[in-house]
Design a protein with these regions (language model features):
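Residue-level detector of Asp-centered blade-edge/turn motifs that repeat once per structural unit
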Residues: 61-62, 107-108, 170-171, 214-215, ...
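Multi-bladed beta-propeller domains
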Residues: 29-53, 84-99, 146-162, 190-206, ...
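A flexible loop/linker signature enriched in serine peptidases of the S9 family
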Residues: 50-53, 70-80, 95-100, 115-142, ...
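Hydrophobic beta-strand positions that form the internal "hydrophobic ladder"
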Residues: 66-67, 112, 175, 219, ...
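Short, low-complexity, disordered segments immediately C-terminal to signal peptides
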Residues: 18-29
């Protein structure tokens, strides 16, 4: 899900990709704010982006680059960009049309995939009617693959409904993602060529944001399974391509979809779970201490739900965490050191 929705709740190519343009020059990583009291896992923080909304930054397999989504170049909705881990070499890799989300490197960092709405409409999707309260729009994303400079764009899925939130298995062979293709928001896997499609979740409600464990045997995700009148309301909104995320908790399952079980019961919105590189803990974002606020913090928890520990201690949004492949760094999106309404990317040296 996009950064804007949550808040309301480098390859150097010799030419820009077709239909794309270089982003304006930006400063490379600057010394960021000092860690807040209690942020013992952060040895040093560096700021990577400066202005706008920037989120969902994911490392390349070699740990040298990041793909992320951003509103910049005067656009009203997110496009995909790649940069070096020091914040330099920023360039757009999506078409510049429609809205994009959830980019990821694959094929030995030789290709990327991301979700985009540009085939359905080149304009930004309309925002949900505010009279409906706090809802997310389920825009008609499909998943595309491209080269890391944005060239060679090819459509991987062709479902014509919300299909996004894709990430990659450790062996590089499987994409896990969320789709509305069968009428509900469920988690699926497929091979990187789009074959061998499998549905993993079947319980009514929103199952999404999946990531594989480092050993490839588990999938961690967020879920909300309403019941009774809440389920009726959920289905009515779904028909209108909307969802109201009243509550999301963290779940874990085997990669074949078996042994689905909830590991948090905190209340509020708990999302963006990601295993630590040793597989011993899960980091995620939550506003459970004040579910009506935008003050999301990062937390660690054991895979059995025990040992909850708060990681960030800043009165702004902190979310979308991802560890570098070697486990020495954490990248995440935060409102710290930013103007109101902005969200920037930060990189911290990680202390276990």
């Amino acid at each position: 899900m996009t950064a804007a929705a949550i808040l309301a709740a480098a390859v150097c190519s010799c030419a820009p990709p077709h239909g794309a343009a270089r982003a304006p020059a930006v400063a490379s990583a600057a010394a960021g704010p000092a860690p807040e009291a209690g942020e013992r896992h952060f040895a040093r923080i560096r700021q990577l982006t400066f202005g706008g909304e920037n989120a969902e930054a994911y490392f390349s397999r070699d740990g040298k680059r990041l793909i992320f989504q951003s509103t910049r170049e005067g656009r009203r909705c997110d496009q995909q960009y790649v940069m070096n881990v020091d914040g330099s070499g920023v360039h757009r890799v999506s078409t510049g049309s429609g809205k994009t989300t959830c980019g990821y490197f694959f094929d030995g960092d030789r290709r990327i995939f991301f979700a985009s709405t540009h085939a359905a409409d080149t304009a930004c999707p309309p925002k949900p009617d505010p009279s409906r309260g706090y809802v997310w729009g389920l825009d008609p994303y499909d998943i595309y693959v491209a080269n890391p400079d944005g060239s060679g764009l090819r459509r991987l899925t062709n479902f014509g409904v919300y299909t996004a939130e894709g990430t990659l298995s450790p062996d590089g062979h499987t994409i896990v993602f969320t789709s509305l293709k069968d009428g509900d928001l469920d988690i699926y896997t497929m091979r990187i060529d789009g074959s061998n499609l499998k549905r993993l979740t079947f319980q009514p409600g929103y199952d999404g944001g999946p990531f594989f464990s480092p050993d490839g045997t588990k999938i961690v995700y967020r879920a909300w399974h309403p019941a009774d009148t809440a389920l009726t309301s959920y289905r009515e909104l779904l028909r209108q391509r909307l969802v109201r995320p009243n509550r999301m908790e963290i779940w874990v399952m085997n990669t074949d979809g078996s042994d689905q079980h909830q590991i948090t019961n905190l209340g509020g919105a708990n999302f963006a779970p990601y295993f630590t590189p040793d597989g011993r803990k899960i980091i995620f974002s939550s506003n459970y201490k004040n579910p009506r606020s935008r003050d999301f913090e990062l937390y660690l928890v054991n895979p059995d739900g025990s040992g909850l520990e708060q990681v960030t201690h800043h009165a702004e949004f902190d979310g979308f965490p991802m560890f570098s492949p070697d486990g020495t760094k954490l990248v995440w999106a935060s409102g710290r050191s930013s103007r109101e309404g902005e969200l920037n990317l930060f990189l911290a040296d990680w202390q276990p």
